[in-house]
Design a protein with these regions (language model features):
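Conserved coupling segment at the C-terminus of the helicase ATP-binding
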Residues: 1, 11-17, 30-47, 52-251
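Short acidic active-site motifs
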Residues: 8
Length: 251
């Protein structure tokens, strides 16, 4: 579609008196309101009425949680760099989505190039095979190899066909070392992405009177995408990695 019907509906709902939506969308919007600085927005809902309330808990767990996994980090690489194998139907990278929007800013373009380049250090094509064979290709894959090795070392039945779960604390020395390296990488990656988000936010505020509605919507969508798909998860992952290097955790 020329415009995503879900995105169009969300945009229209901001000015509606009554909105009917599913639990997942309500929770995601509530979770992202704080991230995007919209918690005090007058257009935020003031009343919620839930039907089939037993779904709320799963929706809340999904919306307000984060997971540091090889899959999630590989998805971020794909979102930032786009299709790298020439076979997958998706996806456009950040260069194609943002390039023409920030073409007038050398600083923003430099940040975009830096972020795209650093994303190479996240898990890439074939990561599952490399991690299972303990042959990591970069810092991120090294961390997940360390996690996998620790799981098999601590599992009571490492040959089980079902999911393996073990206590993470205290983390092995190898996990802590690889966690610090990955944290440094994620911090380096978050810097240019934050610059991009700040630049887009500035464009919205400074050019509000001159932007046509389509361009403004594209910039707003790009800003929300950066916060939801990049800077938000990166901040959560860094907290997890920092926490992993402690001896134990309360709660």
């Amino acid at each position: 579609y020329h415009k995503c019907f879900v995105e169009k509906s969300i945009r229209t709902s901001r000015h509606a008196d009554i909105v009917i939506a599913n639990h997942a969308l309500v929770m995601v919007n509530a979770a992202m309101a704080a991230t995007l600085g919209q918690a005090s927005d007058k257009n935020q809902p003031t009343r919620y009425i839930f039907d089939e309330g037993h779904h709320i808990f799963d929706a809340a767990d999904s919306a307000f949680s984060a997971g540091l996994t090889a899959y999630e980090t590989a998805e971020m690489r794909l979102w930032l760099r786009g299709n790298e194998d020439g076979r997958r139907w998706r996806k456009r990278g950040l260069q194609k989505r943002l390039g023409e929007l920030i073409i007038d800013s050398e600083e923003a373009l430099a940040a975009l190039n830096t972020a795209t380049d650093l994303a190479r250090l996240l898990p890439g094509i074939g990561w599952k095979k490399r991690i299972s064979e303990n042959e990591p290709a970069n810092e991120a894959e090294q961390f997940f190899c360390a996690v996998r090795n620790a799981v098999y070392q601590r599992a009571n039945e490492p040959q089980s066909l079902y999911n393996l779960q073990v206590e993470v604390y205290p983390a092995t020395q190898n996990m802590q070392e690889k966690a610090q390296k990955l944290k440094n990488l994620l911090n380096d990656l978050s810097v240019p992405l934050t610059k991009l988000a700040t630049h887009l936010q500035g464009m919205i505020e400074e050019k509000a009177d001159t932007l046509d509605s389509q361009t403004r919507n594209r910039i707003e969508g790009a800003y929300r995408g950066l916060m939801r798909r990049a800077t938000g998860p990166l901040a959560a992952w860094q907290m997890m990695l920092d926490d992993l290097q402690q001896d134990s955790r309360d709660g």
